[in-house]
């Protein structure tokens, strides 16, 4: 399921992040991938140890927690803290697939934990007219989909998808990206639950008979109980 979720960040929030990232100390993005990825990855990335990365990442996680659509679509169990990248002129990232299992940050005294990447997320931090190229291109069974969204908007898609970032030919593209392990492993099941949840919310808003809504809500939770992993 490819889903555009608008206005995760307000215009003010997105602009503030842009300004702080403009003065950031970026490193070569190839340092974060293996030999295969390094052949096709040409961008900049905030270092893992950057205090700014943690600061902005926490702001994004807070914003995600305020989005009912994001929660309904992802049903998050674990989230890898947001990362940040920058594509300048001639930067690009060829077709690649995200790692299936990723290590979560370890807090002192805690047991190491990992995350299964079910959902890939890209949050755009500057507007499309600020750069040329730089489209996120996602390939699935229906073909290739080009994504280039306003600042503050989020795109989510299954982590099983091959994807790339087209060459930037003018300006600079800044984004945050992260992965989610969902309570529900299968993308088709998540899609069905989102459709059902959306229908329930619509019926509730139209004051449909309470018993009808209750029956549908019961079906939703029973499906979630059947499909979820905790």
Swiss-Prot record:
Keywords on record: Dioxygenase, Iron, Metal-binding, Oxidoreductase, Vitamin C
Recorded GO molecular functions are: 2-oxoglutarate-dependent dioxygenase activity; iron ion binding; L-ascorbic acid binding
Q: Which GO terms describe its biological process?
A: DNA damage response; intracellular iron ion homeostasis
Keyword check for Metal-binding, yes or no.
Answer: yes
Q: Where along this sequence does the record place binding of Fe cation?
A: 96, 98, 163
List required co-factors.
Answer: Fe(2+); L-ascorbate
Organism superkingdom: Bacteria
**InterPro entries on file:** Oxoglu/Fe-dep_dioxygenase_dom (IPR005123), PKHD_C (IPR041097), PKHD_hydroxylase (IPR023550), Pro_4_hyd_alph (IPR006620), Pro_4_hyd_alph_FE2OG_OXY (IPR044862)
Instruction: Give the binding site residues for 2-oxoglutarate.
Output: 173
Q: What class of enzyme is it?
A: oxidoreductase
Q: Locate the Fe2OG dioxygenase domain: which residues? A: 78-182
Recite the UniProt cofactor note for this protein. Answer: Binds 1 Fe(2+) ion per subunit.
EC number(s) stated in the UniProt entry for this protein? 1.14.11.-
The record's NCBIfam families line, in alphabetical order, gives:
PRK05467.1-3 (NF003974), PRK05467.1-4 (NF003975)
Name it.
Answer: PKHD-type hydroxylase XF_0598
């Amino acid at each position: 399921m490819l889903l555009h979720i608008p206005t995760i960040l307000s215009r003010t929030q997105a602009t503030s992040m842009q300004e702080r990232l403009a003065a950031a100390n970026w490193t070569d993005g190839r340092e974060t991938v293996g030999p295969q990825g390094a052949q096709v990855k040409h961008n900049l990335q905030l270092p893992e140890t950057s205090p700014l990365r943690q600061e902005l990442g926490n702001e994004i996680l807070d914003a995600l927690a305020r989005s009912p659509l994001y929660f309904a679509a992802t049903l998050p169990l674990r989230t890898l803290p947001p990362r940040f990248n920058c594509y300048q002129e001639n930067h690009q990232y060829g077709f690649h697939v995200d790692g299936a299992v990723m290590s979560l940050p370890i807090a002192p005294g805690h047991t190491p934990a990992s995350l299964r990447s079910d959902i890939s997320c890209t949050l755009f931090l500057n507007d499309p007219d600020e750069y040329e190229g730089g489209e996120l291109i996602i390939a699935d069974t229906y073909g290739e989909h080009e994504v280039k969204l306003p600042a503050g908007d989020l795109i989510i898609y299954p982590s099983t998808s091959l994807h790339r970032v087209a060459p930037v030919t003018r300006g600079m593209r800044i984004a945050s990206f992260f992965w989610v392990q969902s309570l529900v492993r299968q993308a088709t099941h998540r899609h069905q639950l989102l459709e059902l949840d959306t229908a329930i919310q619509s019926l509730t808003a139209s004051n449909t008979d309470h018993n009808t809504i209750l029956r549908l809500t019961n079906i939703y939770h029973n499906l979630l109980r059947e499909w979820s992993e905790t």
